[in-house]
Amino acid sequence: MHRVRRLHKPMIYVIGCGGTGSHVVNQIVDVHSAMVNQGHEGVSVRAFDGDSVAYSNVGRQAFYLQDVGQPKSKVLIERINMHYGLNWSHRGNLMRKEQIRADIIVSCVDTKASRKTIKSADMNDNTYIIECGNARSSGQVILGQHKGDLPNPYDEHPALTKGKEPKGEGCLDPYYKQDLPVNRQVAVYVQQIIWNLLRKHELSHRGVFFDLAQFASNGVQTTERRSA
């Protein structure tokens, strides 16, 4: 079990607003609305992505034809702010060794270099990191902490940041070599983890590995970081 520290209107960074991140942002605003409706303060979000919307993104990612050519993080956040009366923020890419003031980081990037940038950032030891990834029909969502009680996802799974970049276009694939629902499924699991962090005092599970083609999933039980 992991005892969750109480988070008051947490700041959530969503890093990467493509195939997974664009859906994650929309899932988080649902969490915010549900929390506010129950008398809580909700959450704040800052979205990061340096890319612009392409025609090939429409359909797989949470964008519309009129968004083409616009910065991804900008169009997502401005749409949410307009419809929900919020003041969430957006910007381009996260910089290496950047100072982070987030309670929760959701990593929706698809390169080792981008994950290294997140790992190198200056953040609080207890910052929660939700690491997302997917392949053709499978994916994983893992919750950890920078240097807190839960393992850091990048130390726990070194292959996320070490070695050569895999070949292929990842989530940017315009030819739908990945199953269409896979990014949305990752986003749903992210929503569940954030909901648990905000609504529960203890976590028995902190992630999942799934395969949509096999209709299979395996939860990751919570284990505390071992002392040296």
PLM features per residue range, with description:
Residues 1-20, 24, 100-101, 112-115, ...:
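Glycine-rich phosphate/adenylate-binding loop
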Residues 41-84:
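Glycine-rich phosphate-binding loop and adjoining beta1-alpha1-beta2 segment
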